[in-house]
Amino acid sequence: MKVLHICTTDGGGAGLCALRIHEAMLKQGIDSKVLVLIKKNDRNDVIRFCYLRRLLWRSINRMLRMLHLEITDYNYVTNLNINTGQCFTLPDTIYDVSQHPLVKDADVIHLQWVNGFIDYGTFFKKVKKPIIWTQHDENLFLGI
């Protein structure tokens, strides 16, 4: 069985939890891999997704925010977070994780903290594999 753990980052609580589950599966002889958007460590078994696209997207949005232009929902939510001290997230992203070779090769997908990484609207329509989603907080149903 091939299991793919998807997490926005391999740092922080959910990322570390994903790594612990990944390591436990490897010890049991399960073919386990980890796919992240933001890679915080130098482990070879953690694969970073499309770094250049993320860098370009963040740079463009940073410039738009500096010009006080809320052209995208991402910029609106970012400004809302800064101005209110709250932490809201969006269920859509620019990333199409469903087409990644690791997703296509996996038998089971294990989602951890996927804020800003998984585009809910397209991912669940395109991926027709068993999905396990570990909820580390209320983001899934509240967006915070």
PLM region spans:
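Conserved nucleotide-sugar phosphate-binding/catalytic loop shared by glycosyltransferases and other
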Residues: 41-72
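N-terminal subdomain of nucleotide-sugar transferases
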Residues: 1-53, 104, 127
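Conserved nucleotide-sugar donor-binding subdomain of glycosyltransferases
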Residues: 65-117
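Active-site proximal beta-strand in glycosyltransferases
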Residues: 107-110, 124-144
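Short, well-ordered beta-to-alpha junction loops that form the rim of enzyme active sites
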Residues: 8, 38, 113-114, 137
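Metal-centered catalytic cores of metalloenzymes
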Residues: 16, 20, 24, 28, ...
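Conserved beta-strand->loop/alpha-helix structural units within folded catalytic cores of enzymes
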Residues: 6, 13, 17, 109-121
